[in-house]
Regions:
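Well-ordered beta-strand scaffold positions
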Residues: 26, 58, 66-68
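Short, conserved beta-strand element in jelly-roll/cupin
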Residues: 30-34, 44-62, 99
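Acidic/histidine-enriched, glycine/proline-rich intrinsically disordered or flexible terminal extensions
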Residues: 107-135
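Tight coil/turn sites that cap or link beta-strands
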Residues: 35-37, 73, 81, 91
Length: 135
């Protein structure tokens, strides 16, 4: 495998995500969230871990039955089968990295972006096909 160097500007924009790296063993995306966005629905992944590294601002997570506030420099990881929800920005614009190990989640983001562009909402079958199990 070749070395991978990627700027944010050269990443693939998929909804609110910019995919920075997409490999079999790792997928990294960057998000910018404004305060007031709705949290994601609680879910878990059976086949991969989902990690979030806060670059700037504060995020609030629902993970493993708790609410956790993460400031810049904090890493939050939901290992396989741990229930969590996509975070919300607290107080100000927030930037963070989302890491999936192993990789492959970029396909989910692409299809989700296409669905939203058509005004569609993903159903449970779509979610489960992409290792996302609502609870």
């Amino acid at each position: 495998m070749d070395v991978h160097i990627q700027s944010r500007e050269g990443g693939e924009r998929l909804g609110s995500a910019v995919v920075l790296a997409a490999f079999d063993d790792l997928m990294v995306s960057e998000y910018v969230l404004e305060p007031g966005t709705e949290p994601g629905d609680p879910h878990y992944h059976a086949n991969h871990s989902d990690s979030f590294y806060v670059l700037e601002g504060d995020l609030e997570f629902r993970i493993d039955g708790r609410t956790v506030r993460a400031t810049a420099g904090t890493l939050v990881t939901a290992p396989r089968s741990v229930v969590h929800a996509f975070p919300v920005a607290i107080g100000a614009r927030t930037r963070f990295l989302n890491l999936h190990t192993p990789g492959g989640s970029e396909g989910y983001l692409r299809q989700l972006d296409e669905m939203r562009a058509r005004g569609e909402t993903p159903d449970a079958e779509f979610q489960q096909a992409h290792d996302q199990y609502p609870v």
